[in-house]
C-alpha cells in the first residue's frame, strides 16, 4: 500500500513538472517569435528578455491579458512566477512585485493594452525577469 501511494505521488509530481516544462517551451517559442516579428528600435536592447514589447507580446499570446480585471491578471502572473522562476524566495518576490505592478498600473485610466504594456514594463524594471529560468539559459 505504501509503495502504491509513493508511486502515485511520484507520478503526479512528474506530470506537474512535465506540464511546467511544456509551458516554458511555449513561452520560449512565443518570446522568440515576438522578438523576430516586432521591429527593434535603435534604443532598445539586443536581448529580447530585456525588451518590454517582447514580454508584452509573449504574455499576451499566453493569455495573461485576456481578462482586463486586475485580479485575473494577478492570478495569471502568479502562475507565470511559479513556472518561470525556480528559487522559492524569488518566486515569492516575483509574486509580490507583479501584484504591486498590477495594482499600480491599473489605477490609471488608460486603455487595457497600455495598462498591460505598463505592467510588463514595471515588472521588467524591477528585475524579476533576471531571476527566471529563461534568463539563466542565455
Swiss-Prot record:
Any one Gene Ontology cellular component term annotated for this protein: extracellular region
Coiled coil segments of this chain: none
Subcellular location: Secreted
Subunit structure as annotated in this protein's UniProt entry: Homodimer; disulfide-linked.
Record-annotated membrane-spanning stretches: none
Organism of provenance: Solenopsis saevissima
Chief subcellular location: secreted
Gene3D superfamilies named in the record: 1.10.238.190
Keyword set, alphabetical order: Allergen, Disulfide bond, Secreted, Signal
UniProt signal peptide: 1-19
UniProt KW Secreted keyword: yes
Expression by tissue: Expressed by the venom gland.
Keyword Signal recorded: yes
Family label: Belongs to the ant venom allergen 2/4 family.
Name by which UniProt lists this protein: Venom allergen 2
Amino acid at each position: 500500500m505504501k509503495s502504491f501511494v509513493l508511486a502515485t505521488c511520484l507520478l503526479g509530481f512528474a506530470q506537474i513538472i512535465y506540464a511546467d516544462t511544456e509551458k516554458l517551451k511555449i513561452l520560449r517559442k512565443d518570446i522568440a517569435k515576438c522578438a523576430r516579428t516586432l521591429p527593434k528600435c535603435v534604443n532598445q536592447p539586443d536581448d529580447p528578455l530585456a525588451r518590454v514589447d517582447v514580454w508584452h507580446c509573449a504574455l499576451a499570446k499566453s493569455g495573461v491579458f485576456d481578462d482586463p480585471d486586475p485580479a485575473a491578471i494577478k492570478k495569471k502572473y502568479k502562475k507565470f512566477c511559479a513556472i518561470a522562476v525556480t528559487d522559492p524566495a524569488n518566486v515569492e518576490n516575483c509574486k509580490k512585485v507583479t501584484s504591486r505592478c498590477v495594482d499600480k498600473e491599473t489605477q490609471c485610466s488608460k486603455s487595457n493594452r497600455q495598462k498591460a504594456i505598463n505592467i510588463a514594463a514595471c515588472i521588467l524594471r524591477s528585475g524579476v525577469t533576471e531571476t527566471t529560468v529563461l534568463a539563466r539559459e542565455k
